[in-house]
Amino acid sequence: LGTKEGDLKNLFDDKNSTFWCPDITTRPIYDPVCYLDIDLGEVIKFGQLGYRHRSLNYSHLQCHTFKLEAKKTESDAWTNLGEFVTEALKVDDYQLFPIEEPLETQYIRITFIKGHLRDGKTDWNYSETGNVSVGDLQVFVYNR
């Protein structure tokens, strides 16, 4: 996935004043479909994802819905872990998305589906240029 702005390392620096933007051109339904693949470097028992919006950002530039997938080895098929919805303008804390059935994982894929609506809009039946920017991510090891 191409990067429009920011750097991937900004996703894991615990500062949501730094950010990463994928190279998409249309929102609120993202086009082209964009995803972020993360190689954790080792297998963990994946239990939860922490997601934090970029600070001081307009809500319509924040991700509303994303799909989460994971796999243990590079040659495995992706396991669908579900679609998740973020709360708009919540930038001070991570929003936590637990995995229903934690699994051994080395690779995580986040597919960005659509953004929050622009003020005054009530549904996703419009299109405009724009992007999504992500502040920070956390990957939690399941430990029970």
Where do the model's predicted regions map?
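Short, solvent-exposed loop/edge segments of extracellular or virion-exposed proteins
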Residues: L1-K4
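Short loop/turn motifs that cap or connect beta-strands within the blades
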Residues: E83-T86
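Aromatic, loop-rich ligand-recognition surfaces of beta-strand-rich domains
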Residues: G6, N10-N80, V91-R144
